[in-house]
Amino acid sequence: MSDSLWTALSNFSMPSFPGGSMFRRTKSCRTSNRKSLILTSTSPTLPRPHSPLPGHLGSSPLDSPRNFSPNTPAHFSFASSRRADGRRWSLASLPSSGYGTNTPSSTVSSSCSSQERLHQLPYQPTVDELHFLSKHFGSTESITDEDGGRRSPAVRPRSRSLSPGRSPSSYDNEIVMMNHVYKERFPKATAQMEEKLRDFARAYEPDSVLPLADGVLSFIHHQIIELARDCLTKSRDGLITTVYFYELQENLEKLLQDAYERSESLEVAFVTQLVKKLLIIISRPARLLECLEFNPEEFYHLLEAAEGHAKEGHLVKTDIPRYIIRQLGLTRDPFPDVVRLEEQDSGGSNTPEQDDTSEGRSSTSKAKKPPGESDFDTIKLISNGAYGAVYLVRHRDTRQRFAMKKINKQNLILRNQIQQAFVERDILTFAENPFVVGMFCSFETRRHLCMVMEYVEGGDCATLLKNIGALPVEMARMYFAETVLALEYLHNYGIVHRDLKPDNLLITSMGHIKLTDFGLSKMGLMSLTTNLYEGHIEKDAREFLDKQVCGTPEYIAPEVILRQGYGKPVDWWAMGIILYEFLVGCVPFFGDTPEELFGQVISDDILWPEGDEALPTDAQLLISSLLQTNPLVRLGAGGAFEVKQHSFFRDLDWTGLLRQKAEFIPHLESEDDTSYFDTRSDRYHHVNSYDEDDTTEEEPVEIRQFSSCSPRFSKVYSSMEQLSQHEPKTPVSASGASKRDPSAKGPEEKVAGKREGLGGLTLREKTWRGGSPEIKRFSASEASFLEGEASPPLGARRRFSALLEPSRFTAPQEDEDEARLRRPPRPSSDPPSSLDTRVPKEAVQGEGTSTPGEPEATERSHPGDLGPPSKDGDPSGPRATNDLVLRRARHQQLSGDLAVEKRPSRTGGKVIKSASATALSVMIPAVDPHGGSPLASPMSPRSLSSNPSSRDSSPSRDYSPAVSGLRSPITIQRSGKKYGFTLRAIRVYMGDSDVYSVHHIVWHVEEGGPAQEAGLCAGDLITHVNGEPVHGMVHPEVVELILKSGNKVAVTTTPFENTSIRIGPARRSSYKAKMARRNKRPSAKDGQESKKRSSLFRKITKQSNLLHTSRSLSSLNRSLSSSDSLPGSPTHGLPARSPTHSYRSTPDSAYLGASSQSSSPASSTPNSPASSASHHIRPSTLHGLSPKLHRQYRSARCKSAGNIPLSPLAHTPSPTQASPPPLPGHTVGSSHTTQSFPAKLHSSPPVVRPRPKSAEPPRSPLLKRVQSAEKLGASLGADKKGALRKHSLEVGHPDFRKDFHGELALHSLAESDGETPPIEGPGATRQVAVRRLGRQESPLSLGADPLLPDGVQRPMASSKEDSAGGTEACTPPRATTPGSRTLERDSGCTRHQSVQTEDGPGGVARALAKAALSPVQEHETGRRSSSGEAGTPPVPIVVEPARPGVKTQAPQPLGTDSKGLKEPVAQMPLMPDAPRGRERWVLEEVEERTTLSGLRSKPASPKLSPDPQTPTLVPTKNVPRSAAPSVPPASLMVPGTKPEAGLNSRCPAEAVTPAGLTKTGAPSPASLGP
């Protein structure tokens, strides 16, 4: 073959080969397709030996180069990059091939090798020159092998630019000479390159030019500058190799290809020019280095492999030379496989104009009017955030839903965050990955920057965690793996998320994960290939040196906290925290403040669950590897493949994740359902502020560049447009959407909404930054966190935020709900409103994993408890596994309660969302306390409808059984003093588990009474009272809620058969039953304190039933306080079951007594059910829980366990709830009972921490009166233990139980007022106030002390007792006139006025005090006849809120029967003095029934009454009731009491009106009777 021919074959392009053994140039670069192959013969048919590559060209393998000696003339060393990346450095897209001199023709430049320049040879080298060069390269000696690096992804072997023809002579000397030439020239070329790169980066960096309007191009622009900077850095560090240049070129080509394929903007021309300039800058050093590192031997092998591939693949129809010529394009045929970019360049890399025009054409052809706000109709708010809000919008033309994120410009400008908004836009626009939320368009309005994103319906993982607790391992593995793939994609493009957390992991309608919220992300250097150069891991770990601490504290990596510089490993740290949270249910590190949390992150060891809760070994190893403090050794620092290869994913099919069926699939009531999201309106009010202010005229110019439209939007728009033409257009009212551009906006909006909907609107909002609102999340008061921070203070994460007060969550819908409440409720017969119906369904759907059906099943399992059987379980119920249900139940108890509260509010007057934004489930408190099916609860129509966010309604959030149809609220106008119905608490077990939630049913409706007239039906399940969900509320809370509503109460019910609750035989192991956690979570603080000492897991998984560790205690308090609302307001009632209540219910708070409670969130809520619940000990289930609860609280990391009230479920219900609305001044905390109930609940005395009185919210006068009376009784009974009441911290466990019983805070007002315990003298019988669930039954007249003889004043409760109990240090003045009962009054001192049920000091006779009768007292008086007479109908109690500070007293006949009244009688028998230390009252509740028809106090004797079975709660009607000892007014069900056999639905916490209270603390046998 002639040398001339081989020279002509300088452009040798190898086909791509499967093994990746050969590099293939990207099509965008024509030169990349060229291989420089200098052949010495023009005739392909000449003898092969003359060809440089005899083996390749020859047909026989024997001819391959390896069979030739290096000196063989036929042996030609092709410069091949040692790796498969060997390729020559003529860049097709560049105007010149490398030296900066233009090739004579761009065509030649692109089609021919630029070897001439590389070797500094004439444009047309002579044959002699080529021969000389051939000699130089004839030797097989390989130049230093730089092959250490990995091969570039596209293997494209190519000859080196200097591939001279072969000559028989030896060229070792010439090679040495040429290498010397290159080495000599390379430093100069390198220095020139570095200077040009520096100028290039400075001139074109994003900060120095206006941001590109197109998000994709803006991202690419950023990456090009990053690549230039990286090249400059590596050049200075001496790390540049040929392989590096290959990868750099590949990255640039990939970016350019993305620009052409994904952008329709004319700005592509700008990006193209940037790429060309950069390639020109690096071309000369690249070629010189390529020559220096050329390894002929390797190139031979590559060519041989290529030839073999061509033959095997039948790609070669002719002989090899012709094939090569054709492949090189020397036939001048167009390259079919070349990217159009080259064609557009039309043979000239120097003619970018063509690219521009073609690009322009494509963009213009698709050009539509830019998207604008007017193109979208705003449907509803999805969520609020620190910077703005996310709305569900619908494109007016296509009718497609999107999520529109609206960021307030002013906020961005004030915080200097404008650039970050562009970063988020660019990342979302550029990202194209199934696990990353996509953006469709962006635009600006006068007040906002809007991003339209895809709408992800299922809410976020944080909410899911709140609702169901720890995830099953398989579910956690799938979610984690999908997030790993999303992270791998982002890291490949240099994106560091910096705010990874469950809140930013959205769940799609198919149950898969999408990562969102890039508001805090950083764009670094893309790395599409694996870096093997020395020190790259260290460099990647220190990529950013801004020393900025941002993110969500619980997920911030140690290197960020220490301001050591950070990089991609920070995301892997967050992934470790997330996996731990998925599997354990809470984050591993907690703190009340960011500083405390950071201290733990840096120095503390991880606490691992043990025993049954222990994590799989591989999962624990994976978490430990991810949570390495040193980023250099952290798993993932070397790339995502390190994580993917871990044994935890041994059996995972990484390529088939999207094909796997998800365990949890959100269920949406409609396409506009956003119930899985928390609006967080209580925290942010962007909605109201949006268009009110004028924008600043001096806004930065770059903001005008924010509008963009992604190609995906154009595709969606065009396809949807066609569909939309056939659909009726029903524009949704656009709220705040000005009509701008319809087409582009929709999809992006959807995406934005989706992202925002997840945890919070924006990352920024969720993330913590100094100075920004996020920091508030860390504020000591959890309340702020509760209010809606996506990430609450460290320990108080959103998840834990479930503790948040319901009122906060309900706030957004409060008005709506309240309005509904105000409306006369529809008759119970009415089908539930569609909203209500939807809610249950959503709830079920929302919690795909936990099936409502299961909870339903549990509910059904207690048929005896529930009066009417529920017809069917939720069909979805079966979905969740029993284990998952149980875990969820646990989790929900904490978070679920909150959720329940949220939902009901919607129905009632407030949206009762999960207490924490995180808690997805909204429970229907009335219907299914916790025991119901959590999953089903979402089904409850109200819960779903009530919550704006589907989370609340999602089944996982709710324990309430699925309720297929809720009726409109039934408004019962009290006639006289009674409502005319009796309600009863039932336990609803979840599946076959021992976890139950408390639901309430209408047990009896009095004929001709107000309830019957209003349409209330016996057997209906009560879901909401005054718009507040009662699912999960203990009986006293519900009663309190009803009584505090005044003359009118709005009750929402659903036919039992419409629920998923099934009635079954009584549980024999009911003593093992555990009440499902309410959705309140324990404050993070408490959890934190115990964190080290107690098993974190126990807290989370087991105790989670009572509290969640995630949020700080402060949040609990806040929630309580927030839940406190005006006594009459539905919200006020809400607190009872609200998470706040749960908090109150904390055993500790119970111990603390009223005062402690006051300080506790529970106390803040005056009549919160929780407080009432605290008084009563639940049936045996609660018992069992009580010890656990105590331990859990202690173990919790929270600083002060006392601060965390038990969840309402944990508390025994107290009738107080039933009591009339507390006076405005009354606070939940004020009632002792409220606090005390937790103490009783626990079998072991809880640790009592006194709370400052100052912390106590004002109490309602009624509760105060009741409590003060209770205190009196306690002080009178001080002989037991120095008059320490449950309130006092020192109370012994038994006493504590007794006290618990004695506390009236949760009793109905009638009970509280009438139940002042008699003073115990040596011969005095202790009077036991019996309360009925439905009615206030107390042996005492409200105004009189039945046990005190006339004229005898009751001693004041000892101040010690008060203070110890936390009730009050000061003793309020009392009226102590003979004949009148001594009542404590508020005298400037907030103290809980509770009747003291404990034995008073011995020897003190009690006199009946007669005074003006309060409504409750009148009731008591009316129902009391002469002592010993039982059955005198009580005077109906008129429930009227008493004015604060005003006490009504009424004379009350005294019951002298020391053993207790067989019938509730007005008289309270004197109790014989009993040793305080030993005596404790066990409230046996056969069933909790509250008769709202005629409330009358039923005295209970401390001793076992002859008929302990007598249910105190018997309806006013003549419901058979055995005589039972009166229960001390405040007494709740004591742990150990047995629930009524056969009543599955009876709520253990509802021992509110247990029929039998035994002094010994053991359930009286009779009481256990039905």
Swiss-Prot record:
Tissue distribution of the protein: Expressed in the brain. Expressed in the developing cortical plate, the intermediate zone and corpus callosal fibers that cross the midline. Detected at low levels in the testis, liver and spleen. Expressed in proximity to neuronal nuclei throughout the cortex and cerebellum, and in the vascular endothelium. Also detected in ependymal cells, the choroid plexus, and in developing spermatid acrosomes.
Signal peptide: none
A single Gene Ontology CC term: axon
GO biological process terms, semicolon-separated: brain development; cytoskeleton organization; intracellular signal transduction; protein phosphorylation
Subcellular location, record wording: Cell membrane; Cytoplasm, Cytoskeleton; Cell projection, Axon; Cell projection, Dendrite
Start and end residues of each Protein kinase domain: 375-648
Enzyme Commission code(s) on record: 2.7.11.1
SUPFAM superfamilies xref list: MAST3 pre-PK domain-like, PDZ domain-like, Protein kinase-like (PK-like)
Bias (Basic and acidic residues) ranges: 738-779, 1083-1092, 1278-1294
Pfam families (alphabetical): DUF1908, PDZ_6, Pkinase
Superkingdom of origin: Eukaryota
Membrane topology of the entry: Peripheral membrane protein
Name this polypeptide is given: Microtubule-associated serine/threonine-protein kinase 1
UniProt gene name: Mast1
